[in-house]
A protein has these predicted regions:
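Rossmann-fold NAD(P) dinucleotide-binding segment
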Residues: 40-106
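Rossmann-fold dinucleotide-binding core
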Residues: 66, 87-177, 185
Length: 300
C-alpha cells in the first residue's frame, strides 16, 4: 500500500518509520523537514490513484488549511485520514465536505505518543466503511494486536479519543493527589519505590504509573526542577462540554481540568475574595501581601 504522510513531527515521523517497517510505501510532505515532496501537489503526484493521505498535523487552523488544500487536489476515490486531535464536530463536517466531491474521509483518534513506534498505536477509527477499508492496511501496520477498531461512523473516532483524553486527565489528577498526600505525610516515604511496587499486582497499576516511576527515576522524587504549571490541549474541555450537552455528570474530569487552571495562577483572585469576605463578616485575619518595598525595609 502507498500512503502520503503529511506532517513529520514527533508522532508523524515515528508513524512513518513504523509504516515503512511494515512494508508500506510512504511518500511524505512537511515544509519544515526533508520529505519526498516539496508541496502537497507534488505529494499527490507521487501517489498512484486511488490515493490515501494521512494528516498528522496540529489540530485547529493548520488541520483545516491542510484539509481544504487536499480537497482541491484530491480526486474521486481518494481518502483523507485525519490522525490528529481534531474536534469530532469538525470531523463530521469535513466528512460531509469530502463526500460531496467523491472523496473519503476518516477520523482516526491516535494514542501512544512517542512510545508508539516500538509498541504500536491505539487507533480509534471513525468513518464510512469503504473509506476505512481503503486505509485499513495502515491501521493494521500502526496498531499492536487488538489495538485498532472501527468504532463508528464519521466523527466517532475523534469523539472516542476525546473521551479517552478526558479520562486521562482524571487518572493523572488522581495519581497526582495521592502522591502529594504521601509526599506531605509524617512518613519518610520513597515515592519512587512506591510507584515501582504499585506496578506489580496493584489494583492501581497502569502505564501512567510506569511513566511516573520513570519520571521519579529521572527527575528525583521532589521534582524540584519541574514547575507545577500544567497546560491542557482542549480535549478535556470538549469532553466536559459534551457531557453537559448530554446531561452526564463528570465531576472527576471537571475537577482535573480545573486543577490545571489553578496550576497556572500565581495568585487566585477567588481566594482573595474569600479571604476578604471572611474578614468582613467574622473579623478573621487576612494575610497581607508583602510588597517589594516592605520586604527590603530594615526589620529594626
Amino acid at each position: 500500500m502507498q500512503l502520503g504522510m503529511i506532517g513529520l513531527g514527533r508522532m508523524g515521523a515515528n508513524m512513518t518509520k513504523r509504516l515503512e517497517d511494515h512494508g508500506l510505501d510512504l511518500k511524505t510532505y512537511d515544509p519544515k523537514v526533508d520529505s519526498t515532496a516539496s508541496t502537497l501537489e507534488e505529494l499527490r503526484d507521487q501517489l498512484d490513484a486511488p490515493r490515501t493521505f494521512w494528516m498528522m498535523v496540529p489540530a485547529g487552523e493548520i488541520t483545516e488549511q491542510t484539509f481544504q488544500t487536499l480537497l482541491d487536489l484530491a480526486e474521486r476515490g481518494d481518502v483523507i485520514v485525519d490522525g490528529g486531535n481534531s474536534n469530532f464536530r469538525d470531523s463530521q463536517r469535513r466528512c460531509r465536505e469530502a463526500k460531496q466531491r467523491g472523496i473519503g474521509f476518516v477520523d482516526c483518534g491516535t494514542s501512544g505518543g512517542i512510545w508508539g513506534l516500538s509498541v504500536g498505536y491505539c487507533l480509534m477509527v471513525g468513518g464510512e466503511d469503504d473509506a476505512v477499508a481503503q486505509a485499513e492496511p495502515a491501521f493494521i501496520a500502526l496498531a499492536p494486536d487488538d489495538g485498532y477498531a472501527h468504532v463508528g461512523g464519521p466523527g466517532a473516532g475523534h469523539f472516542t479519543k476525546m473521551v479517552h483524553n478526558g479520562i486521562e486527565y482524571g487518572l493523572m489528577q488522581a495519581y497526582a493527589e495521592g502522591f502529594e498526600v504521601m509526599e506531605k505525610s509524617e512518613f519518610d516515604l520513597d515515592l519512587h519505590e512506591i510507584a515501582g511496587i504499585w506496578r506489580y499486582g496493584s489494583v492501581v497499576r497502569s502505564w501512567l504509573l510506569e511513566l511516573l516511576h520513570a519520571a521519579f527515576e529521572k527527575e528525583g522524587t521532589d521534582l524540584e526542577k519541574i514547575h507545577g504549571y500544567v497546560e491542557d490541549s482542549g480535549e478535556g474541555r470538549w469532553t466536559i462540554a459534551e457531557a453537559i450537552a448530554e446531561d452526564v455528570p463528570v465531576p472527576v474530569i471537571s475537577a482535573a481540568l480545573f486543577a490545571r487552571f489553578a496550576s497556572r495562577q500565581d495568585e487566585s483572585f477567588a481566594a482573595k475574595v474569600t479571604a476578604a469576605l471572611r474578614n468582613q463578616f467574622g473579623g478573621h485575619a487576612v494575610k497581607a501581601v508583602q510588597t517589594a518595598e516592605a520586604a527590603t525595609q530594615d526589620p529594626r
